[in-house]
Amino acid sequence: MPSQVNKAAFEVGRNLGITPGSVVFRNELLELIQYQPTTEQVHTRPVLVVPPQINKFYVFDLSPDKSLARFTLDSGLQTFIISWRNPTRQQSHWDLNRYIEALKEAVDAVLAITGSADLNMLGACSGGVTATALLGHYAALGDQRVKALTLMVSVLDTDVDTQYSLFVDDKTLDAAKRRSSEAGVLEGRDLARVFAWLRPNDLIWNYWVNNYLLGNLPPEFDILYWNNDTTRLPAGLHHDLIELFRQNPLRTPGALEVCGTPIDLKTIEAEIFCVAGTTDHITPWQASYNSAR
């Protein structure tokens, strides 16, 4: 695969992810970063951001002018962002339930630190699916500690045709599960390669022409640096996400059990706001719209 970005132009902590913050909680699966307020007064209710497990947290803090963290801080919000641990084959057993339990601990930590009775959450991609499942679990327990949830490019209802689904059948999904079972993890670069082939003109041949035919350096583009700075998924979570895609259980009340409770998304009382990208080839806006419904 041709390089999409000049990696020498970026470094986390130098020109990426530079908003001041500290790790205030840690468990086996995640670190919780609390960012320093930029206003004299802050809102009581904090916001907790849940990134996708296959990518790194600093997509929400790329640069001062492209930083959700800085925007929320300047808006007077107490801001926390999760950084997921990069698993190895020793953590192959980590599944959706384990990630939700870890997220529950992070929620408890945020509430304990801020003294707030509840919080708002923002989840992106698989992080949004994880956050939604947690809210379903809370709803089953009668727990209202999440006031509002924002979902960014998160698919809860997989009953929609996408470019990705055109290449996927049971045989392909079973083969993917076998591969991650053997390795213990799914390498992020393998998943990125699959997604790139969904838009080959933009994400492959464009760079082939630029890098090899024209002899130019790859461009300096912060979001592409982040997109290429992948992590791994443990086999357990990979298998669960495949079955969510295949069986679409979140659509049917009680079809999915999380942490010992059946999930019914209709019982969630938190306000939910869904965001989609009009040109997103991985999570088309129609899929996010179905989730909102």
Regions found by a protein language model. Name each.
Residues 107-127:
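Alpha/beta-hydrolase fold nucleophile elbow
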Residues 227-263, 270:
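Mobile cap/lid helix-loop segments that gate and shape the active-site cleft of serine hydrolases
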Residues 268, 274-276, 280:
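Short beta-strand/loop motif that positions the catalytic acidic residue
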Residues 1-88:
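Short, surface-exposed "cap/lid" segments of acyl-processing enzymes
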Residues 112, 116, 130, 134-238:
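Alpha/beta-hydrolase-fold enzymes
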Residues 16-18, 64-66, 89-94, 207-208, ...:
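Active-site-adjacent structural elements in folded domains
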Residues 91-114:
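Alpha/beta-hydrolase active-site loop
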Residues 281-287:
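Conserved alpha/beta-hydrolase "acid-adjacent" motif
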